[in-house]
Structures are given as C-alpha cells and as structure tokens.
Amino acid sequence: MANIKEAILTPIFKGNPISVLVLGICSSLAVTVQLKGACVMGLSVMIVTGLSSLVCSLLRNTIPNRIRIIVQLTVVALMVILVDQVLKAYAYSVSKTLSVYIGLIITNCIVMGRIEAYALGNKPFASLMDGLGNGIGYALILIIVAFFRELLGSGTLFGYQVIPQAVFDAGYMNNGLMILPPMALILLGCIIWVQRAIQKDLQEK
C-alpha cells in the first residue's frame, strides 16, 4: 500500500514530470492559453498514461525485449486514438482547438518513460497508479500555467469574464504577452524556481 501511495504522490510533488524531470514541456507551451484546453489535455494524458502503463504491465512477461518499444508505441497509439475519438464525439470544439496536440501524446516522453521505467517491471495496479500519478502531476502544471495565462492575458477563466468591467473602465488592460508561447516558458520557469526554493533537495550542488 505504501508503494502505491508513493507511486501516486511522488510524481505530483517531488518527482513532477514537468517541473522536476523537465519532460513534456512542449505541450505546456502550446495548450495553456486557455484553462479549458489545459484541463482536457491534462486529463487526456492522465488517461493515456494510466491505461498504457496498465496494459504494458499486463503484457510485460510476453513482450520480447527486442520489440518492446514497438509494442509500447502501439499500445499508446491505441489509447490516444480512443481518447481522441471520445473527445470528437463529446467535446468537439475542444478537440478542434487542441488539434494535433492530442495526437502528439503518442510521442510524449512522460508516457513512454513511465512504461519503460516502471510498468515493465511492476504489477498492473501499481503501474496504473504510477501512470495516473504522473498524469495528475503533468495536468497540475498545465492548469497552473493556463490559469495565469488566461486570467492575465484575456481576463477570463474557462471562457467566462472574471475581471469586472469596472476594472477595465478604470484603465486596466489585458496583458497580451501572456497569450504568447514565450510567457508560458517564463511561467514554467517560475514554477520550477518556486518548487526548488521550497524543496532544497532538488537544487543542484
């Protein structure tokens, strides 16, 4: 039970795939202009990572070592296709906004990395929890970045106006820089800086 708890919690805080391992940062720059897109992308990665790790763990004793990467890619691609089809069926506008980024989950370092590093050497349930934990850690960073980008860049959250019109009438203007990709990188850098300031053991000696 302790190992299961560690598999879920470690990727969220101490071993976050984006802020600690610096993996999967491309999508954190691309899909964090709006909070809605970031939430959907985070949920998609969480589902794909969890289910892919589960399936690969179930098959771990039957996969020949020389073709394991091909099998892993096939499993991940299947999960991504399923998620993409569900989005197109039930959230078409979001699917259209995210466009190719959902498909690029197939090449996400986090998904392949957890299968290779954890799922192939551990039991199915633990692998599922590890995949979900890494997906949650990934989604958390995306949501934080998207929150500030949408709020300060557009004055909205989930598309709804949250900054009162009176504030704009007083002279406030949305920060156009926040919706540009470089600002996502700067915000991500700030998150990494804050985390390493809090967790001293993450600082390089």
Task: Tell me the role of every PLM-derived stretch.
Residues 23-29, 45-50, 77-84, 106-110, ...:
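Hydrophobic core segments of alpha-helical transmembrane domains in multi-pass membrane transport
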Residues 6, 128-205:
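C-terminal transmembrane helix-loop-helix hairpin of multi-pass membrane proteins
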Residues 82-97:
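Transmembrane alpha-helix boundary signature
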Residues 52-65, 112-122, 196:
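C-terminal ends of transmembrane helices
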Residues 8-18:
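N-terminal membrane topogenic signal
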Residues 35-51, 71, 95-106:
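Structural signature of hydrophobic alpha-helical transmembrane segments
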Residues 10, 57-61, 126-134:
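Short amphipathic alpha-helical coupling elements at transmembrane boundaries
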Residues 63-76, 97-103, 130:
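Cytoplasmic-side transmembrane-helix entry/capping segments in multi-pass membrane proteins
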